[in-house]
């Protein structure tokens, strides 16, 4: 009987100990992530300035061989690593526009010419201007399909008005 009582009391103590450690560990884990009161604003010579006006010197010891990985990305392109240090992140990459080839330049010129001829047809309402504008719109490349449809609609609107001389 004494052994059963001792076993039950040990199990109860173990259960209480396990629950308290899990509660404490979840509380510690919730502190590390999520919104922070202090956010880094700038970094200058390993001195981090926070938004509340405080400063902190940061150093990563040479013997620390654990791999660095990004833990959190802050505003102002500042990155926080798993060892608690801060650095500026990589600069955003901008894709330079590709140089235009002769073919694309010719296609754009045909589009501009078609726009000018449609504009002229809208002003004059003549049969010859209509033929020139329609031919130019038909020669516009399929790459400018949306603009081509808009030009065709403009020609159709003028034809619906009537009075083509």
Curated annotation (Swiss-Prot):
Keywords: Secreted, Signal, Virulence. InterPro entries: Efb_C_sf (IPR036233), Extracellular_fibrinogen-bd_C (IPR021033), Sbi_C3_db_domIV (IPR041909). Residues 1-29 form the signal peptide. The keyword Nucleotide-binding does not apply. GO terms for molecular function: complement binding. It is found in: Secreted. Interacts with host fibrinogen alpha chain/FGA. Interacts with host complement protein C3. The keyword Signal applies. SUPFAM superfamilies: Efb C-domain-like. Extracellular fibrinogen-binding protein that plays an important role in virulence. By interacting with the alpha chain of fibrinogen and its derivative fibrin, enhances a non-functional interaction between fibrinogen and platelets and is responsible for repression of fibrinogen-dependent platelet aggregation. In addition, assembles a fibrinogen protective shield around the bacteria which results in impaired phagocytic clearance by the host. It comes from Staphylococcus aureus (strain MRSA252). This is Fibrinogen-binding protein. It comes from the Bacteria. It holds the Pfam family efb-c. GO terms for cellular component: extracellular space. Its main location: secreted.
């Amino acid at each position: 009987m004494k052994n059963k009582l001792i076993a039950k009391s040990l199990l109860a103590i173990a259960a209480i100990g396990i629950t308290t450690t899990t509660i404490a560990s979840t509380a510690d884990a919730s502190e590390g992530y999520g919104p922070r009161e202090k956010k880094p604003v700038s970094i200058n010579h390993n001195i981090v300035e926070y938004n509340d006006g405080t400063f902190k010197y940061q150093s990563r010891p040479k013997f620390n061989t654990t791999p660095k990985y990004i833990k959190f990305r802050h505003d102002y392109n500042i990155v926080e690593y798993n060892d608690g240090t801060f650095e500026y992140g990589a600069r955003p990459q901008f894709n330079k526009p590709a140089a235009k080839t002769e073919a694309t330049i010719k296609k754009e010129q045909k589009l501009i010419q078609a726009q000018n001829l449609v504009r002229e047809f809208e002003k004059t309402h003549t049969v010859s201007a209509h033929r020139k504008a329609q031919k130019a719109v038909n020669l516009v490349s399929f790459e400018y399909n949306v603009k081509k449809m808009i030009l065709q609609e403009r020609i159709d609107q003028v034809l619906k008005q009537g009075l083509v001389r």
